[in-house]
Amino acid sequence: MAPKKDKKPKKSTWKFNLDLTHAVEDGIFDSGNFEQFLREKVKVNGKTGNLGNVVHIERFKNKIIVVSEKQFSKRYLKYLTKKYLKKNNLRDWLRVVASDKETYELRYFQISQDEDESESED
């Protein structure tokens, strides 16, 4: 028999990006305030404000990067982003869209001008 090798669990990290470029450039979204919101609201082991060395939240200009050493769901990040938008009354204008596997992006809702004009004529 071949000797068994010790299997060490891989230390994996989860990394997600939030692209806030459009909303920040238009001046309706404060990325610093949102970063602080995430630091206060992200739960680790069922407790908020317990980031420690497990979850790192960084801001580079108009992007926020969340790196976690413990399992962290991309869906949870979307949930917190939507919660922040609702709290600041931005939910009616902005939506959270996945642009790729590790990135969310804030985009404006597309409202067609043709529908508004036809309704006002009636």
UniProtKB/Swiss-Prot annotation:
Question: What's a single GO BP term from this record?
Answer: cytoplasmic translation
Q: Which GO terms describe its cellular component?
A: ribonucleoprotein complex; ribosome
Could you tell me the superkingdom of the organism this chain comes from?
Eukaryota
Q: Which GO terms describe its molecular function?
A: RNA binding; structural constituent of ribosome
Q: Which InterPro entries match?
A: Ribosomal_eL22, Ribosomal_eL22_sf
Protein family? Belongs to the eukaryotic ribosomal protein eL22 family.
Q: Which residues carry this modification: Phosphoserine?
A: 112, 118, 120
Which terms are listed as keywords in the entry?
Phosphoprotein, Ribonucleoprotein, Ribosomal protein
Q: What is this protein called?
A: Ribosomal protein eL22-like
